[in-house]
């Protein structure tokens, strides 16, 4: 059944009511006393100057925040004061354990999500994955200090032999300590390996368009639409809530941040030393080259090249590193 379209007058009235509500909350926020009791909470979502904050007891509050707090994002831990039954004001941003950022249109890093512990890299047979892009995701995980999980999706698209060959392509990542799992949203129990790895973690899914991230999110969060609808009703943000980052809680203790912006994540601006650090298996060889200014291309006595020749570093990983290093020069 088609949704009834609102008249211009009705839309204007709704906008007016929402504006009056925002103004009222803003006045209450400004009048909040510094001496009043504060509570700790978690940012479930943000849209503009509006936050949905979940208190320790699980109740959610619609909050504004003070301008001097900087950029607050989904997953942040905050201190807030109540100003009404279901409304409050955030007065302090607590220190972050981790923050995932990506460059904005001006090239500056823009925080997307905070306090994550796991980056789930989703790959699929189609579109064909590239080691170059996969390595960018893994570098991001290394630099912000979170665990990475490589998830091979859409197992149902290939025969058992083809799938085994596809899995074999990623054995080089298992050899350097990255867990690799296979999942399918269409198979019975096809999500169990992923759910097991998500337990006790705050995770974000990243990957190319078309690898099935949305299908996995919808399968993991079957009541996602209901949660987004409740957020829309609570926040007064209407349809805009479908495109904002949202923190979801699973029954097994897992937390997932669902965000279109995060899912299309790309690596931000880094320097050469950070790039080297992002390749974890390079660590034993850094600083061991014959020349201190070694570029790891064809210099004699290059420790990385010798490690490749000895089978300790996969040649494609060094190739991808050199390609990325060119972008920095």
Which residues fall in each region the model found?
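N-terminal accessory targeting/assembly segments
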Residues: 1-131
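Canonical P-loop GTPase G-domain recognition
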Residues: 157-211
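Catalytic P-loop NTPase motifs of RecA-like helicase/translocase cores
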Residues: 129, 158-159, 189, 263-266
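Histidine-anchored nucleotide/phosphate-binding helix
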Residues: 133-147
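Conserved beta-strand/loop subsegment of P-loop NTPase cores
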Residues: 116-123, 144-156, 174-183
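Helix-rich effector regions associated with P-loop NTPase G domains
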Residues: 2-8, 37, 74-86, 94-118, ...
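Walker A/P-loop
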Residues: 209, 214-215, 219
């Amino acid at each position: 059944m088609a949704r009834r379209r609102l008249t211009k007058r009705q839309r204007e009235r709704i906008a007016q009511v929402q504006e009056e509500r925002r103004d009222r909350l803003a006045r209450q926020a400004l009048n909040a006393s510094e001496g009043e009791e504060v509570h700790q909470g978690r940012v479930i979502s943000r849209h503009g100057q509006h936050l949905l904050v979940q208190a320790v007891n699980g109740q959610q509050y619609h909050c504004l925040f003070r301008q001097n707090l900087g950029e607050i994002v989904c997953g942040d831990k905050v201190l807030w004061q109540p100003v009404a039954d279901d409304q409050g004001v955030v007065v302090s941003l607590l220190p972050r354990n981790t923050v995932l950022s990506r460059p904005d249109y001006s090239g500056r890093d823009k925080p997307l999500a905070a306090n994550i512990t796991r980056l789930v890299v989703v790959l699929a047979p189609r579109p064909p994955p590239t080691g170059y892009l996969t390595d960018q995701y893994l570098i991001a995980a290394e630099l912000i200090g979170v665990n990475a999980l490589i998830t091979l999706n859409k197992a149902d698209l290939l025969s058992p032999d083809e799938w085994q060959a596809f899995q074999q392509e990623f054995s080089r990542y298992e050899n350097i300590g990255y867990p690799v799992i296979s999942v399918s949203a269409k198979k019975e129990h096809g999500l169990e390996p992923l759910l097991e790895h998500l337990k006790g973690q705050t995770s974000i899914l990243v990957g190319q368009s078309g690898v099935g991230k949305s299908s996995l999110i919808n399968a993991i969060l079957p009541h996602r639409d209901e949660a987004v609808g409740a957020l829309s009703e609570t926040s007064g943000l209407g349809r805009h809530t479908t495109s904002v980052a949202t923190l979801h809680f699973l029954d097994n203790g897992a937390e997932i941040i669902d965000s279109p912006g995060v899912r299309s994540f790309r690596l931000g601006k880094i320097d050469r030393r950070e790039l080297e650090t992002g390749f974890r298996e390079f660590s034993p060889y850094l600083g061991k080259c014959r020349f201190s200014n070694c570029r790891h291309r064809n210099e004699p006595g290059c420790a990385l090249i010798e490690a490749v020749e000895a089978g300790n570093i996969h040649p494609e990983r060094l190739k991808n590193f050199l390609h990325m290093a060119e972008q920095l020069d």
